[in-house]
């Protein structure tokens, strides 16, 4: 579950994402919190390496329609499902969810064709040159997976 601080940050991030945007989601509490904060948005798209239950919620609520993505119209494109049995059942046989390899979901030429793409990820630290570390803290790998 996202923390109270993550929910406040998520509210600010969601305010920066316009209706009709396509989102890419990382893993962890912050991307989950941002998805929850997006429930008032309209006609969002999803093109992401992985999705969790909150994306299924947004599709069911009509927030994610994938109508304005520029490519893969009408379909949430993802390389993996990370969530509950409900998510697996939701995606199984669902034409609105398209499973693709990372060669597609992370391909620069494909990503360049996605309209109005916003990447939502969390990080552990950022250095002075702008490089983001999202996996290691204090010499130890962080558990970055959070399912909601």
What are the residue ranges of the model-derived segments?
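Conserved alpha/beta enzyme-core scaffold
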Residues: 1-148
């Amino acid at each position: 579950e996202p923390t109270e601080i993550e929910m406040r940050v998520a509210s600010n991030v969601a305010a920066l994402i316009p209706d009709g945007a396509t989102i890419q989601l990382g893993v962890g509490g912050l991307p989950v919190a941002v998805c929850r904060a997006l429930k008032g948005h309209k006609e969002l798209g999803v093109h992401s390496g992985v999705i969790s239950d909150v994306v299924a919620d947004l599709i069911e609520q009509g927030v994610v329609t994938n109508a304005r993505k520029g490519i893969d119209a009408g379909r949430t494109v993802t390389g993996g499902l990370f969530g509950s049995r409900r998510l697996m059942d939701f995606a199984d046989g669902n034409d609105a969810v398209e499973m693709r390899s990372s060669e597609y979901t992370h391909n620069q030429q494909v990503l360049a064709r996605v309209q109005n793409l916003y990447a939502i990820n969390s990080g552990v630290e950022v250095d002075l040159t702008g490089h983001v570390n999202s996996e290691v803290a204090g010499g130890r790998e962080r558990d970055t997976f959070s399912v909601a």
